[in-house]
Amino acid sequence: MSDRVRVRYAPSPTGYLHIGNARTALFNYLFAKHYDGDFVIRIEDTDSKRNLVDGESSQFDNLKWLGIEWDESVDKDKGYGPYRQSERAEIYNPLIQQLLDEDKAYKCYMTEDELEEERQQQIERGEMPRYGGKHAHLTEEERQQFEAEGRKPSIRFRVPKDTTYSFDDMVKGEISFDSNNMGDWVIVKKDGIPTYNFAVAIDDHYMEISDVIRGDDHISNTPKQLMIYETFGWEAPRFAHMSLIVNEERKKLSKRDGQILQFIEQYRDLGYLPEALFNFITLLGWSPEGENEIYSKEDFIKIFDEKRLSKSPAFFDKQKLAWVNNQYMKQKDTETVFELALPHLIKAELLPENPSEADLDWGRKLVSLYQKEMSYAGEIVPLSELFFRDEQTLGDDEQEVIAGEQVPELMNHLYSKLEALEPFEAAEIKKTIKEVQKETGIKGKQLFMPIRVAVTGQMHGPELPNTIEVLGKDKVLSRLKKYV
């Protein structure tokens, strides 16, 4: 293993980029960049039946969108390739044969039914289910008999007895496993494909991976990988097992959990900002010193410290994500936010599919009204609902405001002035409201609240003159007329 920091993110193309996997990639990326090391992406694609056609490309595309840049992968071979497990058979096969020749592994011909029967018997006896070693010492005659029956063997690693496998985890501390609690495990499946724990240890060694940073659901895999390192006389990498991400019920974040969007692509489609997701995800199970919660990618690289990875589960707080994204939305120029919001306005049929320049200008004004409130670009649709409804239904508080004794006089003055107003723009509208104030003597909440309720149906909202401009003269006069 080299002295240089080399870490890897090893996704399977059986699915799209999940929040949990994105966090694994992020922490590996930040760790590598903090130590001026290499961030490697390796594709674990041996489960060909479950691989998605666009699974691999989607992973790369969404990582790039998040701002995660890799130093090595299928598109950047730095001499450690191939970077797809399916293309590394020439590396695995001699090592498999070596283990067979040294009697450190053996062929097992047991069927799935036989293995399940053994497992059930162990459970009935109150034992921990594990392979009992029935085919660990077959004679040549027995092997030939199984072959003649058409049985295809798997290959099992012969687990050493009375051995303790320990490692000092960067997050969890010292962790140990007793080999006597483990059965001989499969390193090559019946179809000839190496299993995860065998292949990953081989790959990490030959790619000179110095540190393995992953979720703590992989802790139980570690002793098997340590066995492979030990049996070949290789130095094991350092390990860091991150705490799991949990939902509001403090249950492990599951892809079947309908309460939380699970995939980066979903947030991307809604109009979340990549730098906001980068920021939010980095704070899932890791915390910087101090109270600040908004950092740039460059800041995170500078301050990232693996010692601050949390042992406790990371809570996925949807409200916190909305807040973080809103902080970034407020900093963006309106044109950027408008470009993100435009597809949502068109999809909701609030703008035509082929908008004119006038439509686009109106859309920009609409977005500028709500930019400081927006948690994500797609939120422009529910936020701006008041601009598009034909009928307004007032709540009790709104009805109380509009029933004020000063309202008829106020509405008469405002209606006549707005009807004659040209150009119908926010600055002129603001002047008009001030003129109404002077002429009627109505001021403060008595002035502004009835106007807002009359034109928007709401007690609160964006700047009133700007709102009136974006609503447009016809719609505003139509709504005011009810109270004249």
Curated annotation (Swiss-Prot):
GO cellular component, as recorded: cytosol
Coiled-coil ranges per UniProt: none
Top-level EC class as recorded in UniProt: ligase
Keywords attached to this entry: Aminoacyl-tRNA synthetase, ATP-binding, Cytoplasm, Ligase, Nucleotide-binding, Protein biosynthesis
Catalytic reaction list: tRNA(Glu) + L-glutamate + ATP = L-glutamyl-tRNA(Glu) + AMP + diphosphate
Record-linked Gene3D superfamilies: 1.10.10.350, HUPs
Motif 'HIGH' region mapped to chain: 11-21
Pfam families, alphabetized: Anticodon_2, tRNA-synt_1c
Subcellular localization, as worded in the UniProt entry: Cytoplasm
Record flagged with keyword Membrane: no
GO biological process entries: glutamyl-tRNA aminoacylation
Nucleotide-binding is among the record's keywords: yes
Family (UniProt): Belongs to the class-I aminoacyl-tRNA synthetase family. Glutamate--tRNA ligase type 1 subfamily.
Function according to Swiss-Prot or TrEMBL: Catalyzes the attachment of glutamate to tRNA(Glu) in a two-step reaction: glutamate is first activated by ATP to form Glu-AMP and then transferred to the acceptor end of tRNA(Glu).
Assembly information from the UniProt record: Monomer.
Name of the protein described by the UniProt record: Glutamate--tRNA ligase
Upper lineage: Bacteria, Bacillati, Bacillota, Bacilli, Bacillales
